[in-house]
Amino acid sequence: MTLGAVSAEGAKLDETDMVGVSFWLATAMMLASTVFFIMERNNVAAKWKTSMTVAALVTGVAWYHYTYMREHWAASYAEGAGESPLVMRYIDWLITVPLQVAEFYLILAAVGAATAMLFWRLFGASLVMLIAGFLGESGQAPEMPMLAIGVAAWLYIIYEVRAGDAKKGADTTSEGTQFAFKAMAIILTVGWAIYPIGYFLGTGEDANTDALNILYNIADVVNKTAFGLMVWYAATMDTKASSSEE
């Protein structure tokens, strides 16, 4: 099914389709978050506007893709068995996940505590994680080795954020920025752990497509929306602190 083959006028949502419900809820949350981040962008200092723009892009791009993913699922569910929108989901992740990882760099860059090399290391690790995941889930490579590679890349990102240059840079920032950075690191550690769990449940002969998609949808809402809210919190706290010093 191509992107152009589905629309908001497609298959109806079945009341027993909990996966479909999770797709619809995720779509609504992504749209609401995007509107909020765009409006709040005008209330933060200039140095934070790029970070707020990226937060809005993450949820905005996700909203666009979810409008198609939910219809893909509903249409296939109506035909007898829900089909996971694998390609659409990974296209979304290929755009939004590197943007999320870049937020760590942007937050530190906003207060002058980041280097370009940090950005490229985080960006590269996120691509390795995504490419390995897609190759494994699509059957183009062995599932478990690809899961191991993806998890290794994720653990490297966690290391950079919790113990590497990103952590060292965050320690020199304001209290509000440090709090937001730590909260984002928790989301990266705990929230992103949902993805390999979903991946694992969707592999093998007894693959649970329903559980995989529900977990992926929950993870996307938590990680994209909550992640953006932490950026917003850091921006507003730093803006207030700067205003009080003037």
Regions found by a protein language model. Name each.
Residues 46-55, 114-120, 181-184:
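Membrane-interfacial loop-to-transmembrane alpha-helix junctions, especially the N-terminal start
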